[in-house]
């Protein structure tokens, strides 16, 4: 199956059902005749900007990150930071962003797209982003940017 078709089906499943884990998504895909590995589904989730969010019942589920056509990278970053970042801390010239579980890679991708001059690079895990800035002053400036997005 082609990637575009698989991603279309993933989007359809996530919009129609409350899917909580990658394993559950893989199972749902198999039920409709689509075989995909965990690595493939993980890549699709990242590429499609799928994030984990809290449903009305408080349970965590996958959702398509809202991206209006033509929305700038800065606006996408602002929305993802506001929705996902739960706290941050600075260690000298490194800023650590803590996100909702499963959302760090999406926020990190948007940070990379925006390419702030004070940011040398980012590394993302499941719920943590390490942002390496060029100096302690740049780290403070970056924190101010993020705080302005949240508040």
UniProtKB/Swiss-Prot annotation:
It is found in: Cytoplasm. InterPro entries: Arg_repress (IPR001669), Arg_repress_C (IPR020899), Arg_repress_C_sf (IPR036251), Arg_repress_DNA-bd (IPR020900), WH-like_DNA-bd_sf (IPR036388), WH_DNA-bd_sf (IPR036390). GO terms for molecular function: arginine binding; DNA binding; DNA-binding transcription factor activity. It comes from the Bacteria. Regulates arginine biosynthesis genes. HAMAP family: Arg_repressor. This is Arginine repressor. The gene is argR.
């Amino acid at each position: 199956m082609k990637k575009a078709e698989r991603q279309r089906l993933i989007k359809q499943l996530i919009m129609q059902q409350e899917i909580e884990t990658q394993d559950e998504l893989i199972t749902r895909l198999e039920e409709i005749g689509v075989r995909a590995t965990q690595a493939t589904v993980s890549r699709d989730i990242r590429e499609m900007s799928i994030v984990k969010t809290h449903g009305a019942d408080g349970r965590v589920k996958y959702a398509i990150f809202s991206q209006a056509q033509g929305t700038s990278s800065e606006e996408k970053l602002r929305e993802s930071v506001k929705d996902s970042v739960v706290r941050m801390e600075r260690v000298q010239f490194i800023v650590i962003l803590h996100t909702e579980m499963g959302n760090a890679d999406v926020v990190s991708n948007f940070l990379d797209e925006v390419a702030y001059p004070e940011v040398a690079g980012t590394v993302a895990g499941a719920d943590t982003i390490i942002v390496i800035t060029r100096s302690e002053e740049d780290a403070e400036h970056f924190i101010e940017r993020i705080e302005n997005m949240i508040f």
